[in-house]
Each structure stands twice: as structure tokens, then as C-alpha cells.
Design a protein with these regions (language model features):
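Acidic, metal/ion-coordinating pockets
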Residues: 1-267
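Hard-cation-handling environments
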Residues: 270-311
Length: 311
């Protein structure tokens, strides 16, 4: 599992890349393991390798790497609502989110869960998107053309209850459909500033999760045990950001769930590596073209305070 890759695709072996992750997945499969590759959001935005074609090549790389599932993070909306929806259609893998709603119909925009049957077990994933998307993307993208009213919502609630209710409803659906294991695939994070919408608070106010793969706060968290509303402990994990790690969650024959974070991998899928190299070269060439010269100095951070002034 990955999260918050943010288009950092120009790493060098043995650092992690989509080519390395594709090779890692194949290696596990060749060893007789059943493997699912999932992402917890924020994969199409962050560098020019994403913005130069609005995430098209990133999705192509994820397709080639063999991703099976993803949930949208707040930055999946940075290129506008139409592009966000187009990206999800370009993906060969499904997106899920239990709390992204079309206010015109009252219906969820995406499936709330995805079930996989593997080795006789039914593994359900529940997708969750941060309600902070409204403030950490562009609110106008969630409005009608005249920007007079919102036509989409990311359910949250000032006290978090709308979010908790949406998540619990999705968990209950997975249970009804016979899930053996239920895993959250969320872009929520654990930063206190995200309260009451953190993954820890969602776990604490719901029942039914066996594990939760998180994103958003860029936190390196291999395995944290969080009590749910019934007192049962749930494994919470997050890889950090920018391909610093890829997570490996293992469901043992005895049902025990373990996680580890992998920092480097020597292997690389040749086809995925070639796609990445071609795009990196093309973007680097475009960025290297001088189009103007300015006499003034431009700052992202305030020189006096060091605080970021431009987003």
C-alpha cells in the first residue's frame, strides 16, 4: 500500500518507484502469495510530473504497476471536478469513497466499498476521503457553474458525526455482504488540526474495522493499535509520503494482521520504468526551456520569517 506519493516519480534505485513496486508485487505473487496493491490518495498532484498533464501519466504508471484499488485524497481534486472524475475513469482500478456525495441526488459519487475474494476470504475495503478537501483543495470545484451553491459534499460534520455515520454504514454493508476482513482505505491522517476527522477518531467512533490504511498527514506509522467504539484494537498504518516507504500488510492463515514498511527495493519492472523515464525526460526538457528573465527575486517563503507565503 502507498499514500501521498504526490508524483515523486524520479527516484533512483534502490529508492522506491512505481517500477519497483510493480516488481515487488510480482515477486510476492511469484512466491505464491495473494497480493492486492492499494493507494490511500494524493497521487496525481505535487510536482510538474503530475501537473504537466493533469495526472494522466501518473495514472498510466499506476495502471502499469498493477494497482487494484484507490481512494481519492484532497489533491485528486486540484485539477477541477471534471478532471477528478476523468482520472478515475482512466484508471484500470476502481476508486472508493463512502463520504463523497452528490447533493443533487443524495447519492454517493463512488462505490463506498470494494470486496475481493482471495484464498477463500472476503476482504472488504471501505474508502474514506478527508472533509478537509474543501479547504485544502479549491471549494469552487464543488459548486455549480455559477458558483452559487455546492453540488458536492465530503461528509464530515462539525463534530465528526456525519463522517462516522457514513463510515459505519459502509462497514455494516461490508458485514452484510459477508466480509471476512474489513480494512479502511482512508485519506484522513492523524494530525490534531484535522480533528474531528482523523483516522484515529473515525476508528474510535465506529466498530468493525480490522485494519486501517491511512494517508493525508504524511505520517510514518508502521503499526499503531487504536481501540474502536467496542474496545477492539484496530491496526492503523501509514507510509509517510513521497515514496519514502511502501507498506506491506499481511493477513496470516490464523487471521492475524501484521504490517511492515519497506524503505528500498532493488528490483524494477522494465516496462513501468520505461514509461516513467520517457515522461520524466519530456517534462525535464519542458522545464528547462527559458521563457522569460526577471530582475526581481521571487520567494515562496517569507525571507524574514521563513513561513510559506504561496501555496
Amino acid at each position: 500500500y502507498t499514500n501521498d506519493v504526490h508524483t515523486y516519480i524520479d527516484k533512483k534505485s534502490p529508492e522506491l518507484t512505481y517500477a519497483a513496486i510493480a516488481a515487488l508485487k510480482k515477486s510476492c505473487e511469484d512466491a505464491g502469495q495473494n497480493v492486492l496493491l492499494v493507494d490511500a490518495g494524493d497521487h496525481i498532484q505535487g510536482t510538474a510530473y503530475g501537473s504537466m498533464d493533469d495526472g494522466e501519466t501518473i495514472i498510466k504508471l499506476m495502471n502499469e504497476a498493477g494497482y487494484d484499488l484507490a481512494t481519492p485524497g484532497n489533491h485528486e481534486f486540484d485539477y477541477g471536478m471534471a478532471r477528478a472524475k476523468a482520472v478515475m475513469k482512466e484508471a484500470d482500478f476502481p476508486y472508493i469513497s463512502c463520504n463523497w456525495v452528490d447533493l443533487r441526488t443524495g447519492l454517493k459519487v463512488l462505490p463506498t466499498i470494494k470486496m475481493f475474494t482471495i484464498g477463500g476470504a472476503r476482504i472488504a475495503f471501505v474508502g474514506v476521503t478527508t472533509p478537509e478537501t474543501f479547504t485544502k483543495s479549491t471549494p469552487a470545484y464543488f459548486m455549480n457553474a455559477s458558483q452559487t451553491k455546492y453540488i458536492y459534499d465530503i461528509l464530515g460534520g462539525d463534530d465528526g458525526q456525519k463522517l462516522y455515520n457514513a463510515v459505519q454504514k459502509a462497514i455494516d454493508k461490508a458485514k452484510f455482504l459477508g466480509a471476512t476482513y474489513i480494512i479502511g482505505l482512508g485519506h484522513l491522517g492523524v494530525d490534531p488540526s484535522s480533528s474531528p476527522w482523523t483516522s484515529e477518531e473515525v476508528i474510535a467512533h465506529t466498530t468493525g474495522f480490522d485494519a486501517f490504511i491511512d494517508g493525508h498527514s504524511h505520517t510514518v506509522m508502521e503499526n499503531k493499535q487504536v481501540a474502536d467504539a467496542s474496545g477492539k484494537t484496530v491496526t492503523l498504518t501509514q507510509t509517510g509520503s513521497y515514496f519514502k516507504n511502501v507498506g506491506k500488510m499481511t493477513i496470516g492463515a490464523d487471521g492475524a494482521i501484521t504490517t511492515e514498511l519497506i524503505h528500498t527495493y532493488e528490483g524494477a519492472d522494465a516496462a513501468v520504468a520505461a514509461t516513467a523515464a520517457e515522461w520524466i525526460s519530456a517534462v525535464d526538457d519542458m522545464l528547462g526551456e527559458e521563457i522569460a528573465v526577471g530582475d526581481s527575486k521571487f520567494y515562496i517563503n517569507d525571507p524574514a520569517t521563513g513561513k510559506r507565503r504561496i501555496r
